[in-house]
Amino acid sequence: MAAEIKEENLSLALRFIVEKFGKDALLNQNKVKAILPDLLSNKFTTETSWVMDAINSGIVGILLNPNNTNEEAIEKAKDVFENHYVTEIRQEYVLDCLSYALGWTNTKVDSLDEYKAKVNKKNS
């Protein structure tokens, strides 16, 4: 699967980490930061930085809290993002990537440019 990821994207790489190391691996920024470059051909992109920021700001902890339903967790995560003045596209992209990684959805997230194009098309 790791070979396939090099041709794919961040959401698939995050799902690989969850499948190989468990959901709690996403709580460990150092582990994620060490693994992602190998999975993504050493491409540390804007999107990757956004995920690292989400880990640092406690977003993943909120998503993994067993006291929250998936929907409640996403709403609480959005509140944290908004308190940090994170743009809506960044919020949605990161939450969609993490939702895919956690198995909450089977919709793989595209590259950021493709994602933005789909959002713009959907909103028009």
Predicted features, each with a name:
Residues 2-119:
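Charged, amphipathic alpha-helical regulatory modules used
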